[in-house]
A protein has these predicted regions:
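TM-adjacent membrane-interface loops and short helices in multi-pass inner/ER membrane proteins
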Residues: 254-302, 313-317
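Hydrophobic alpha-helical transmembrane segments
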Residues: 126, 269-278, 390-397
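A juxtamembrane structural motif centered on a specific transmembrane helix
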Residues: 1, 362-412
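Short, Lys/Arg-rich, polar N-terminal cytosolic tail immediately upstream
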Residues: 1-10
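Hydrophobic alpha-helical transmembrane segments of multi-pass inner membrane proteins, especially
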Residues: 16-264, 311-368, 392-396, 412
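Helix-boundary and loop/linker segments of multi-pass membrane transporters
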Residues: 8-9, 135-136, 294-297, 339-340
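Transmembrane helix boundary and interhelical junction motifs in multipass membrane proteins
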Residues: 155-160, 283-289, 300-302, 369, ...
Length: 412
């Protein structure tokens, strides 16, 4: 029985290795297809970067996460300093200042800040779980620093990732779902203020009722909730005009109707959906997509790699990739549930949230169900910093698997 259980655990670990490496291999071919008419070798760099990432993951797999705890604040401080450096000496591209050039290689600190934030947030929540409303100030303080520095780059997509992983980790640590909903609700109010103003007549009283029923000092809590949402509704138009860059506003507007500017801001969305639709059931074949080969979609090898997948492998290929990500998330949930400590469990759930949020947002973007955000598709999109961070994440999760297995063996 023990031998069979051991074999099953060993086989499950191949989910965390096999799926990402398989996606990287396919992505190299897709990237090569997007650049066949140009003298680029990004497909080669994609595989080389993944190879470096695998080595890093193998090292981290053998390092117990508990040993990282003394270094979490310095790591977090270093990533924050790098985000500040982006503002001072960063490289600007495509209208945003997000990179630092080191030896001719562009490094994107915001990618590494995700991992640093997850690790420190996990340490804070495992030591100080949110049992009172005031306790939420600690995790908010941790996440707000990198969030703000990333938002002003500007990088709206990555800033959303920070918010998603914080809310999920708060819930996983034991925070009531009602409190999580109240934290998220001002963002919903902002969306309603811009799109469906009449919905606030129902939404704001509903949130006030939720605050009254779930928070201490019920009347004060509900009054403060109404004030916060009312202020958000008033401030949203100003934020729309002055808080977002012109191209960010265009992306949000054109998401609703790309045909308003088919040769400008809506071009990416329209061509992406055409490419995916042209793939049909089985696709044109790897390296055979006409829209992909002719480079109808600029920068397709980065944020829009899923459209190349759709054109060349069809619905079946897209479905297999989506199922692969679902299987990866299911395995991460299993690892988080069986982790030895709350800290390790929170790290895994934060990493899972980071990866799956990016998957959902990127795929929705490429099929026309979401605005263009600049969020890459994990293990598939070209991007050196993102690829290394993906494998760092994988290595941390594998470390939890390894330590859990050792604990299980010790109990035997």
């Amino acid at each position: 029985m023990f031998a069979r259980n051991h074999r099953q655990k060993h086989q499950r670990e191949w989910i965390l290795w096999g799926l990402p490496i398989g996606m990287v291999a396919i992505a190299g071919l897709l990237i090569a297809s997007t650049q066949r008419q140009a003298d680029y070798a990004d497909w080669y760099h994609h595989w080389i970067t993944a190879g470096v990432g695998v080595v890093v993951a193998l090292i981290l797999e053998r390092l117990p996460l508990q040993r990282l705890k003394p270094f979490l604040l310095p790591i977090f401080g270093l990533t924050v300093a790098s985000l500040v450096a982006v503002r001072l000496i960063g490289t600007t591209a495509l209208g945003a200042q997000r990179w630092i050039s080191i030896g001719g290689i562009h490094v994107q600190p915001s990618e590494f800040a995700k991992i640093a934030a997850i690790l420190l947030l996990a340490a804070v929540l495992s030591k100080h779980p949110v049992e009172r409303p005031v306790d939420v100030l600690r995790p908010l303080g941790v996440i707000s620093i990198p969030w703000l520095l990333v938002f002003i780059q500007p990088d709206l997509g990555t800033s959303l990732v920070f918010g998603a992983l914080m809310l999920t980790m708060l819930y996983w640590s034991g925070m009531p779902i009602e409190w999580v909903t109240l934290l998220l609700s001002p963002l919903v109010t902002a969306l309603f203020a811009g799109i469906f103003p009449w919905a606030m007549v129902i939404w704001i009283p509903l949130m006030a009722l939720l605050a009254y029923r779930s928070l201490p000092w019920k009347r004060i809590a509900s009054t403060i909730t109404i004030a916060i949402h009312g202020a958000m509704a008033i401030v949203t138009p100003w934020l729309w005009m002055h808080g977002l860059k012109d191209y960010q506003r265009d992306r949000l507007v054109l998401f609703l109707d790309p045909s308003q500017d088919p040769l400008g801001g809506g071009y990416h969305l329209l061509q992406s959906t055409v490419g995916i639709g042209s793939g049909g059931l089985f696709g044109a074949g790897l390296l055979q997509g006409q829209l992909t080969k002719l480079r109808f979609i600029p920068e397709q090898h980065t944020d829009f790699i899923f459209s190349a997948l759709g054109e060349e492998t069809g619905f079946i290929g897209c479905l297999l990739v989506v199922l692969g990500f679902a299987l990866l998330m299911a395995r991460l949930l299993q690892v988080a549930r069986h982790a030895r400590s709350d800290f390790e469990s929170l790290v895994v759930i934060g990493i899972g949230t980071m990866l799956m949020f990016q998957v959902v947002v990127n795929i929705f973007m490429t099929i026309g169900l979401g605005p263009v955000t600049g969020i890459p598709l994990p293990f598939l999109s070209y991007g050196r910093s993102a690829m290394v961070v993906n494998f760092i994440s994988l290595g941390l999760c594998l470390s939890v698997v390894r330590q859990s297995r050792r604990s299980f063996a010790g109990l035997r």
